[in-house]
Amino acid sequence: MTRRYWNINLEEMMEAGVHFGHGTRKWNPRMAPYISAKRKGIHIINLTRTARFLSEACDLVFDAASRGKHFLIVGTKNKAADLIASAARKARCHYVNKKWLGGMSTNWSTTETRLQKFRDLRAEQKTGRFNHLPKRDAAMFKRQLSHLQTYLGGIKYMTGLPDIVIIVDQQEEYTALRECVTLGIPTICLIDTNSDPDLADISIPANDDAIASIRLILNKLVFAICEGRSSYIRNR
């Protein structure tokens, strides 16, 4: 895999607060190699390590996108939900930003059934079929559609398991990460100082609570994916 330059700037990361970890009492000792200092009761993340692993992640997603691979971005924190959705749409990735339903990947046949139900209901709504049903039935189908849109809206075009999964906040998305590990799906994971850096294929040490930090990391990955997709289109 060729290494490329992704304009990852340490000063820019500091301005976004990427270096702020959790309180020193909440740390995972395995994160010690990624921590540079303690300040006012919190751990400070070593941004040179962040830059290194973010660059590796950008190389990986560029290479995968240039070969037409598919991505899934997972981040279900309320304050980051809109950011996850917009980043995924920009890079034409699938996403989960509300709740990871247990077995979403390991029990893919059930997920496929739910997705087909979702597509059928969307088609019926578009054709106006709901308008010809009794009010009670129409209301029931609309509730089902709303529920499916909330939890499956970001993966409605998925036809199979993703090739790479990008996870924002290891602690919050532990179930999703474990499912990916079980299936052997490569993972890129934002990890704060309370995380285990050994679980994902590429772990990017970063503040996973601040929106500015999450946005910066995602923007770099999205740019790399978009560049890879452009390369794929040119070389087809």
Curated annotation (Swiss-Prot):
One of its GO terms (molecular function) is structural constituent of ribosome. One of its GO terms (biological process) is translation. GO terms for cellular component: chloroplast; mitochondrial small ribosomal subunit. It is found in: Plastid, Chloroplast. Keywords: Chloroplast, Plastid, Ribonucleoprotein, Ribosomal protein. HAMAP family: Ribosomal_uS2_B. Belongs to the universal ribosomal protein uS2 family. This is Small ribosomal subunit protein uS2c. The gene is rps2.
